[in-house]
Amino acid sequence: MIAHIINLMRCNVHVAIVTAAGYPGEAQKFERRLEGLLETFRRLKLPPDVTDRFHIMGGECNYLLRVTPVSKRLEFVPDAEWQTPDMKSWREEDIQAMLTDAQSLLVECSKRLNISVQFMRKERSVGIVPISPTIYEVLEDIALTVQNQLVARVPFCGFNGGNDVFVDCGNKSLGLQAMMAFTGALPHETLHVGDRFTLSGNDTATRDVCSVLWVANPDETGFFIKMLLKDIRKSRWQPYIE
């Protein structure tokens, strides 16, 4: 997969990982998730004009990171450089009120379904992680309940992560829109690849923004990237004409 990502970047394609994971002010935690990729950037001594095409959008749409030109580490892009006007209009008190209400719903659902959970609250998200194994449908029930009952003044995303349920400020659709504006990509030039397109998944909202590809595992992602690279190479010697 690392080779596929680098080959895309060398073909002038921007590659961004849009993830629910959010670590405000802690770029090193994002780096730990991508140690192999960043180390390969360093080992191959990739020039900045290549690594500038790699980004991470964390917390659905709350944190944008880029690769530093020399050390090939991750750094946060200042909010003023990439946030959309709508994002800049969100008030902190409204965000915290949404998270508090979401936490109350998560508590209520956990008690109703009689499951023991650990709560996690961050700057822009709140969630539960079951302490003991539970069935998928229980998490599905909680995610759908939050989606339908939570009312807030800011956009939010309540989703079943498979082993947990989280509510984030914003959603991946907003993250993609901000990412596209930042890189200058148009909707017809953008493809979002994900595996959580069900009603309780956090990829679903992206269908309103660009083309999507629903995959089941990383192997499928790799297969389609190889197809894309093959088409890109073909187009260089055989231009597409309608």
Predicted segments, located by residue:
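Active-site phosphate-binding/coordination module
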Residues: 3-115
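A generic structural motif
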Residues: 10-14, 154-156, 188, 209-210
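Short beta-strand/turn micro-motifs composed of small residues
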Residues: 19, 58, 130, 194, ...
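Short, glycine/serine-rich, charged loops/turns that create anion-binding
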Residues: 22, 61, 130-133, 197
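Short, charged/polar "capping" segments at the starts of alpha-helices
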Residues: 24-27, 136, 221-223
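A short acidic, often aromatic-flanked loop/helix-cap motif at beta-alpha or helix-coil junctions
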Residues: 56, 62-66, 126, 163-167, ...
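Conserved acidic, metal-coordinating active-site core of Asp-based
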Residues: 101-191
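Mg2+-dependent phosphoryl-transfer enzymes with acidic/Ser/Thr/Gly-rich catalytic loops
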Residues: 166-168, 173-242
